[in-house]
Amino acid sequence: MDPLIQELTKEQLRDDMPEFRAGDTVRVHVRVVEGTHERIQIFEGVVIKKRGTGIGATYTVRKIASGVGVERTFPVNTPRVAKVEVIRHGRVRRAKLYYLRTRSGKAARITERRR
């Protein structure tokens, strides 16, 4: 890759992101702009996938809201995300947890990883 492009992308990368993987439960603090007012909205759920590296990396978080599954994909390096907190580390044997979409209730549980 061109050194100039590498230098520009390195400036854009965030260094305040915690380490998390698929199966971890995270709390994402998202900045929401409503007119002239800006507030923080919290989206808490299980990380079902992480994709890519560098500036284009994304992760998808899934939660159940009012009995309906909601998935939201966030870029890792976006300024719209104020912070990410890792609530618990889950023990899974897959990198992509798409099977959670078909499961509900106790079948969708993920055991906690021992540290």
UniProtKB/Swiss-Prot annotation:
Any single Gene Ontology cellular-component annotation? cytosolic large ribosomal subunit
Where are the annotated coiled coils located? none
Domain of life, per UniProt, equals Bacteria
Q: Which GO terms describe its molecular function?
A: structural constituent of ribosome
Q: What keyword terms does UniProt attach to this protein?
A: Ribonucleoprotein, Ribosomal protein
Q: Could you tell me which SUPFAM superfamilies the record lists for this protein? A: Translation proteins SH3-like domain
User: One of this protein's GO BP terms?
Assistant: translation
PROSITE patterns assigned to the protein according to its UniProt record, in alphabetical order: RIBOSOMAL_L19
Ribonucleoprotein as a keyword of this entry, yes or no, is yes
Could you say which protein family the record assigns here?
Belongs to the bacterial ribosomal protein bL19 family.
Task: Tell me, in a sentence or two, what this protein's role is.
Answer: This protein is located at the 30S-50S ribosomal subunit interface and may play a role in the structure and function of the aminoacyl-tRNA binding site.
Its name, as the record gives it, is Large ribosomal subunit protein bL19
- Gene symbol? rplS
